[in-house]
Amino acid sequence: MPVSRIAVGAPGELSHPDTAKAAVAEFISTLIFVFAGSGSGMAFSKLTDGGAATPAGLIAASLAHALALFVAVSVGANISGGHVNPAVTFGAFVGGNISLLKALVYWVAQLLGSVVACLLLKIATGGAALGAFSLSAGVGAMNAVVLEMVMTFGLVYTVYATAVDPKKGDLGVIAPIAIGFIVGANILAGGAFDGASMNPAVSFGPAVVTGVWENHWVYWVGPLAGAAIAALVYDIIFIGQRPHQQLPTTAADY
């Protein structure tokens, strides 16, 4: 069971150089992803006089996020695993693939990367409007939670199938492409209803910079729940039992 492999982590893990490198990689990858993803919406809105919330704008957002995530995951994969998403990190934690301490370090790096990306967008565009995530008319908070949960389930399930599963083989090579594709497809499916976040960091940065926090909890509860379910389902059904690896207990063990 994945629960038996969940670990808090050793104190030495926080001070280990590899943890610092992984945090920097997550910060940069998330910055790249959010800057390109949110920036594409700002650019489309400027070019079309506020047309980001149109079918064409949705397609542009889907394409930009898919391409940006492909790059962000690729450049971080060999250093941090290329999570670029607190929900993915949470799914990895639930599956026993990362300790709690290291997961929290990843979260801080990802959230900071998103905030810095949004601040840079505001500065670089001369204060252009940055869109915060919100619910469309007729979409309730619980509707959005379910939507985010299902979309993030698909994302984290894809991550497990292509990047985490020890039996993935050559499939691991295309993991960043598959991950980018599922996010792009989900934006086409859910973008018109709640913005299709699937990533608490992507929602957090714009909320901090714009000060718009209405229903922000939706973009945490839905993705985290979906990630946990995906991790448990994939691990229990497809990965199954595997030997528990003792986490390092001293700095010398790393």
From Swiss-Prot:
Give TM segment ranges. 24-44, 56-76, 103-123, 144-164, 173-193, 220-240
For this chain, the annotated S-S bridges are none
Look up the record and give one Gene Ontology term from the biological process aspect.
Answer: water transport
Topologically, how does it sit relative to the membrane?
Answer: Multi-pass membrane protein
Entry annotated with the keyword Kinase: no
Per the Swiss-Prot or TrEMBL annotation, the motif NPA 1 is positioned at 85-87
Kindly indicate whether the keyword Metal-binding belongs to this entry: no
What does UniProt give as GO cellular component? membrane; vacuolar membrane
Return the InterPro entries for the record.
Answer: Aquaporin-like (IPR023271), Aquaporin_transptr (IPR034294), MIP (IPR000425), MIP_CS (IPR022357)
What highest taxon heads this organism's lineage? Eukaryota
Q: Where is this motif: NPA 2?
A: 199-201
Q: Name one Pfam family in it.
A: MIP
Query: Family per UniProt?
Result: Belongs to the MIP/aquaporin (TC 1.A.8) family. TIP (TC 1.A.8.10) subfamily.
Q: What does this protein do?
A: Aquaporins facilitate the transport of water and small neutral solutes across cell membranes.
Q: What is this protein called?
A: Aquaporin TIP1-2
Question: What species was this sequence derived from?
Answer: Zea mays
Its lineage opens with: Eukaryota, Viridiplantae, Streptophyta, Embryophyta, Tracheophyta
